[in-house]
């Protein structure tokens, strides 16, 4: 963090602006909106500033800048066309420990101006730390388009009702959940339609009927890249009181969780320790019964080998209300980032997803079905049984020359794709770090041509015979989107 984001209360505070031209006028316009007492040090003013001085909206000192002008002001802005003067202002302000900004000269600023989205009293500031002001402006324009003009009205109405809500709902958690519900419900829709009177009636009604019970959201976190989390999923984790997450949820996803939410790891891996599923189920029920908003955050999609169905059965049995937010499953995300299409008119007319980690009493796998040609087979959690998988598929007719891949840490910067054939699948799996996904089928042969993730999609040798690695993901999904 190059700059600490802070909002300053300038109402009634003296602010010195050095310069009387168009640049100074732009800064003065913003300062006046904030209620600052603006003093202008310049021998001449342009027409816009002359009009403001004539209306007594600014104090024109009618002289060139002098060191004495700094003594009694709160902060200083140097906006003259004289660079030497601007830098002199900077050094004098620094010697007095006064905040100072020299316009368009980042090296001579103790603070900088962000791009601002103004929905008074709501304000959003966007900054590139002075590195890319055009990028900051473009981001501001996008945010302007997303945020309704009624946002300010919503904040003002909420402010008027704040004491009433505080009197009715005693805990911070209750109040936060109440407001989150209003800002995502009918109250917000009424304000957006400029029906403010009806909106306040809706607030009164909701406050009287406020539901205090807990709730569980089962959220799919996607395959790893935070940019692949759904918008609904993001909303849920930012409204949660507590998040129960597993080992497949990436750090990038966890960084998006509401900062004051409690985080509890309930993960499990095939090679390591585990939290028993029964304990996770019981924990969800207990937290919901405490009146908390719980998010059960699971890697990939919760209903694709994620035991999400079992967890919801528990919630339903205990009459805990819940919702489900699907996620991009690893088979879809990791193969896309590896340049391996799951289906292709020339190679595969179907795709089959199976798990290599089953219950002890599960029925036998239909290997004959899995060994069919012209289909793509994707195996989750199969790295430990890669040798058995390859053997059984070949026994049931799949050619040992069938292309195969093991994708590790799919969609993350460290993603690696090892390719070879069914004959050496076990060697590929042995060298692949977890979590790993096995892909078998002719479409794997397209990887070398279609690999795109990472700036250069570089290749490096693999000690396993007939195999290679593609070093994918030199940057995160967020960076690619921002670029």
Curated annotation (Swiss-Prot):
Top-level taxon of the source organism: Bacteria
Binding sites annotated in the UniProt record for NAD(+): 22-23, 43-44
Keywords: Cobalamin biosynthesis, Lyase, Methyltransferase, Multifunctional enzyme, NAD, Oxidoreductase, Phosphoprotein, Porphyrin biosynthesis, S-adenosyl-L-methionine, Transferase
UniProt-listed InterPro entries: 4pyrrol_Mease, 4pyrrol_Methylase_sf, 4pyrrole_Mease_sub1, 4pyrrole_Mease_sub2, CobA/CysG_C, NAD(P)-bd_dom_sf, Siro_Cobalamin_biosynth, Sirohaem_synt_dimer_dom_sf
UniProt entry tagged with the keyword Iron: no
Pfam families given in the database record: CysG_dimeriser, NAD_binding_7, Sirohm_synth_M, TP_methylase
PANTHER family: SIROHEME SYNTHASE, SIROHEME SYNTHASE-RELATED
Family of this protein: In the N-terminal section; belongs to the precorrin-2 dehydrogenase / sirohydrochlorin ferrochelatase family.
Name under which the protein is recorded: Siroheme synthase
Protein species of origin: Neisseria meningitidis serogroup C / serotype 2a (strain ATCC 700532 / DSM 15464 / FAM18)
Lineage: Bacteria, Pseudomonadati, Pseudomonadota, Betaproteobacteria, Neisseriales
């Amino acid at each position: 963090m190059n700059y600490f984001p802070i909002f300053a209360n300038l109402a009634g505070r003296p602010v010195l602006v050095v310069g009387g031209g168009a640049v100074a006028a732009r800064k003065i316009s913003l300062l006046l909106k904030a209620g600052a007492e603006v003093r202008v040090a310049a021998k001449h003013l342009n027409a816009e500033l002359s009009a403001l001085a004539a209306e007594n909206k600014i104090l024109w000192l009618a002289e060139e800048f002098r060191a004495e002008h700094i003594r009694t002001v709160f902060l200083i802005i140097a906006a003259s066309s004289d660079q030497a003067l601007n830098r002199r202002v900077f050094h004098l302000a620094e010697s007095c420990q006064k905040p100072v900004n020299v316009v368009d000269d980042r090296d001579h600023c103790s603070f900088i101006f962000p791009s601002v989205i103004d929905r008074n009293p709501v304000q959003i500031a966007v900054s590139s730390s002075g590195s890319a002001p055009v990028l900051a402006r473009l981001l501001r324009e996008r945010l302007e388009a997303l945020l309704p003009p009624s946002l300010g009205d919503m904040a003002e109405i909420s402010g008027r009702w704040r004491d009433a809500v505080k009197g009715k709902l005693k805990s911070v958690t209750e109040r936060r959940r109440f407001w989150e519900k209003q800002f995502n419900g009918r109250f917000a829709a009424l304000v957006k339609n400029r029906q403010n009177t009806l909106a306040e009636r809706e607030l009164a009604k909701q406050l009287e009927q406020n539901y205090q019970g807990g709730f569980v959201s089962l959220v799919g976190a996607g395959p790893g890249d935070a940019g692949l989390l759904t918008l609904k999923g993001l909303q849920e984790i930012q409204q949660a009181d507590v998040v129960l997450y597993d080992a497949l949820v990436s750090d990038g996803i966890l960084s998006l969780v509401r900062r004051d939410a409690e985080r509890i790891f309930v993960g499990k891996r095939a090679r390591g320790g585990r939290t028993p599923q029964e304990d996770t189920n019981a924990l969800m029920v207990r937290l919901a019964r405490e009146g908390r908003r719980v998010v059960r955050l699971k890697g990939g999609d919760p209903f694709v080998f994620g035991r999400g169905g079992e967890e919801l059965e528990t919630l339903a049995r205990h009459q805990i209300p819940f919702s489900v937010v699907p996620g991009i499953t690893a088979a879809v995300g990791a193969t896309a980032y590896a340049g391996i299409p799951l289906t292709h008119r020339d190679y595969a007319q179907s795709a089959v997803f199976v798990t290599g980690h089953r219950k002890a009493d599960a029925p036998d796998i239909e290997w004959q079905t899995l060994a069919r040609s012209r289909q793509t087979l994707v195996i989750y959690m199969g790295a430990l049984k890669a040798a058995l998988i390859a053997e059984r598929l070949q026994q049931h007719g799949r050619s040992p020359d069938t292309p195969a891949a093991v994708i590790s840490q799919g969609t993350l910067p460290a993603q690696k794709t090892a390719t070879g054939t069914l004959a050496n699948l076990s060697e590929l799996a042995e060298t692949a770090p977890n979590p790993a996904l096995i892909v078998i089928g002719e479409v794997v042969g397209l990887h070398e041509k279609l690999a795109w993730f990472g700036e250069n999609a570089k290749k490096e040798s693999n000690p396993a015979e007939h195999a290679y690695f593609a070093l994918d993901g030199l940057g995160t999904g967020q960076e690619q989107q921002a670029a």
